[in-house]
Amino acid sequence: MKVVIIGGVAGGATAAARIRRLDEQAEIVVFERSGFISYANCGLPYYIGGAIEDENDLTLQTPESFWRRFRVKMNVHHEATAIHPDSKTVTVKNLENGKILTESYDKLVLSPGAKPIKPGFDGIDSDKIFTLRTVEDTLRLKKYTDEHHPKSAVVVGGGFIGIEVAENLRELGIDVTLVEAADQLMAPFDRDMASFIHAEIRKNSIHLMLDTKVEGFADTDCGIDVKLKSAPTLHTDMVVMAIGVAPETTLAKDTGIELGIKGSIVVNDKMETSIPIKPPPTTTADFG
């Protein structure tokens, strides 16, 4: 049996390891668009602030170590661009040299993950605006702070990532403003619990702006302006957007796989998508 997995970060790498434990003979091939596999996003902000000092500590495995341990072929910088259920093949682009290849499969696992939400605000594509989802995002943000030595930063979004980014930028001595559209940080928390978070944020000299919505951005000669709906414009050296993520399901949608109302992939109790698995012509399947 040959299994192709699209996505090699947390879910994809875990699936590959589990499949290997269940089947020692299976051929397992993973395609990952980024240059890194098997990492947890939770630790990324702490590389920015220096709590994690070594870049290599951000990842649990490399393609080489994964092959040695599990005999799974990890292809980084490879993006799956099309799925062909009728022929049971996947079209893949090598992002390093632009070559296109076709990979066959018996079973296909989708683990595309999520992407940061970036609203269509004016100025959203500024090179002074960052997101933090991948190792590449982290290295880009770290490079910017190391080379440009920003004195101020605005973090938009008061969830886990936003708070952790604000904490770690503050550790660098940066003057940080945390902007949240709701009337509290950490929406899943009760208001009385969130109040403790608010107090801790302020205790660490982070400016907290609640009930404040961002409307757009504008580059300036010496930084970037953050336009707010109900408050004066903030001038800062850099911005980190951390207002949540959305399912990365463009490939699934293009394939005709059913999606839910929020864009995630619909599956049954066996984690199968709306496109059934077709048995090879030489076998007999029992659907009873």
Give names to the regions the model predicted:
Residues M1, A26, K107, D127, ...:
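Nucleotide donor/acceptor-binding cores
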Residues M1-N75, A166-F189:
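Beta1-alpha1 glycine-rich phosphate/pyrophosphate-binding loop at the start
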Residues I6, E103-G113, V156, L234-G244:
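Short hydrophobic core segments
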Residues T59, L139, S152-A153, F160-F217:
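Rossmann-like dinucleotide-binding cores of NAD(P)H-dependent redox enzymes
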Residues R69-H84, N204-V214:
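A conserved beta-strand/loop element that lines the FAD pocket in flavoprotein oxidoreductases
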Residues H84-T102, A218-T233:
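Conserved beta-strand-loop-beta-strand element in the redox core of flavoprotein oxidoreductases
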Residues L110-L172, H207, V267-D269:
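Glycine-rich dinucleotide-binding loop and its adjacent helix/turn
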Residues D125-H149, C222-K227, T233-G288:
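FAD-site-proximal beta/loop scaffold in flavoenzymes
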